[in-house]
Regions:
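Short, flexible, solvent-exposed loop/turn segments with mixed acidic/basic and small polar residues
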Residues: 8-16, 110-119
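Short proline/glycine- and acidic-rich turn/helix-capping motifs at secondary-structure junctions
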Residues: 52-63, 71-78, 155-167
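Internal, hydrophobic cores of structured domains that mediate oligomerization or house catalytic pockets
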Residues: 1-8, 106, 126, 155
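Surface-exposed, low-hydrophobicity interaction/linker segments
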Residues: 59, 63-108
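Glycine-rich, aromatic-bearing surface loops/beta-hairpins
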Residues: 120-168
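N-terminal, charge-rich interaction modules
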Residues: 3-45
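Short, well-structured beta-strand/strand-turn elements
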Residues: 43-55
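Long, low-complexity, intrinsically disordered terminal regions
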Residues: 1, 6-9, 14, 147, ...
Length: 168
């Protein structure tokens, strides 16, 4: 009697999960100063604070305290040693919760990069959900009008090798 082994392969495409727009910002300012100037030049009022420990259904979230303090935390294991990287994050939601804006620092507190293939960008502005092309161009121009901003450019997240770092 012969046995037949069947193999199941699951091909997961990250591109189907990338439902956001990504803007790269090169700027020597600290993150809180950049947030101040973005709110001054546009209508986006970023907030950095503690995330609710309870979700909208009343259940406790399965996140550790570092993640609740509006950090993105990534763990890497090298030679049986676990290292954590903490990236600061600021958030803004409009009144109707149609848009979510996240300002992410490309450099962690420990010195590692969130998107290692784009080391020249200091920050990333991630916009979840749909935004009109004209509104997007206007937002990029508003960011470019900040005197300390050297470069603001829309990026294609599907072309990035470390795009999974932007899914949270």
């Amino acid at each position: 009697m012969s046995t037949v082994k069947k193999h199941l392969t699951i091909d997961f495409d990250f591109d189907s999960e990338l439902d956001f727009i990504l803007i790269g910002i090169s700027c020597p300012l600290r993150d809180y100063r950049l947030c101040h100037f973005i709110s001054k030049y546009s209508s986006i009022e970023f907030v950095r604070g503690k995330e609710d420990y309870i979700d909208h259904k009343g259940y406790a979230k399965e996140k550790d305290k570092d993640e609740m303090d509006f950090h993105i935390v990534y763990e890497k294991t090298k030679l049986k040693k676990v290292s954590k990287s903490h990236f600061s994050m600021y958030r803004y939601c409009d009144e109707n919760f149609e848009f979510e804006y996240y300002l992410l620092n490309n450099r962690s507190i420990e010195g590692t990069l969130l998107i290692s293939e784009l080391p020249n960008f200091d920050y990333f502005l991630l916009i979840k959900h749909y935004i009109d092309d004209e509104d997007l161009r206007g937002l990029i121009e508003e960011i470019k009008n900040i005197p300390e901003v050297l470069l603001a450019k829309e990026l294609d997240p599907s072309s990035l090798k470390s795009k999974e770092n932007l899914i949270f």
